[in-house]
From Swiss-Prot:
Pfam families: Yip1. It is a multi-pass membrane protein. It comes from the Eukaryota. This is Protein YIPF6. It comes from Xenopus tropicalis. The chain crosses the membrane at residues 85-105, 112-132, 143-163, 181-201, 209-229. The keyword Transmembrane applies. GO terms for cellular component: Golgi medial cisterna; Golgi membrane; Golgi trans cisterna; trans-Golgi network.
């Protein structure tokens, strides 16, 4: 054992003998940083809403919905609707449009119940069908991103419905119908253009027409419902 320990000590001395004359000059600064950056942790803390007041959370969500409304009214190639998707805005627009379509001649006997259900089902079922068609054609966006865009782009038609109701309160003449026709046509084109501006780039170039055509039909059906609405006389 003593011989083994002596052999080990001599081997260690020979191994580190060459390092005994190595020195670091005082003129050469030794630089470096051994601290671990905490940027990712701070970002996660900023995004956490566990300690955030409910009022701040609601105001932030309302601001996000308002920003998406602006993107629809001024459509351009942007990823805001796709990146920060939500279904609160589409739900509000769908309910608002269905409520404004109540009270027409077609559903006066039923007190507007079926009309509300028709609008609600047409909008959401149509959006789901368009989304599935987009995915089957090779679209690159997710299911809920497509629903978000299609739902938010109902905003122009909701505005058209509001204008049509105001016009019908004034008169039921041919001139009022022409005004409603112009408003609905413009808003229909606006909704179609806005939705395709967000969704067209997510489709393969040779299949974009197949993806845009159902969107055209979707907003055309909603526009027809808005145009043919007539209050109870």
């Amino acid at each position: 054992m003593a011989e083994t320990e002596g052999f080990g000590d001599s081997g260690s001395k020979q191994l580190f003998a060459g390092l005994s004359n190595v020195s670091i000059s005082g003129d050469i600064p030794v630089e470096g940083e051994i601290t671990v950056p905490m940027a990712s942790t701070s970002q996660e803390d900023d995004l956490s809403t566990l300690d955030e007041p409910v009022k701040d959370t609601i105001m932030r969500d309302l601001k996000a919905v308002g920003n998406k409304f602006l993107h629809v009214m001024y459509p351009k190639k942007s990823t805001t609707l796709l990146r920060d998707w939500d279904l609160w805005g589409p739900l509000v627009l769908c309910v608002s449009l269905a409520l404004m379509l109540q009270g027409g001649n077609a559903d006066s006997k039923d007190d507007g119940g079926p009309q509300f259900a028709e609008v609600f089902v047409i909008i959401w079922f149509g959006a789901v069908v368009i989304t599935l068609n987009s995915k089957l054609l090779g679209g690159t966006i997710s299911f809920f991103q497509s629903l978000c865009v299609l739902g938010y782009c109902i905003l122009p038609l909701t505005v058209a419905m509001l204008v049509c109701r105001l016009v019908l309160l004034l008169s039921h003449t041919t001139a009022s119908f022409i005004v409603r026709l112009v408003v609905v046509t413009v808003m229909f084109a606006w909704s179609t253009f806005a939705s395709t501006a967000f969704l067209a780039d997510s489709q393969p170039p040779n299949r974009r027409a197949l993806a845009v055509y159902p969107i055209f039909l979707f907003y055309f059906v909603i526009s027809w419902m808005v145009l043919t609405f007539n209050t109870v006389s």
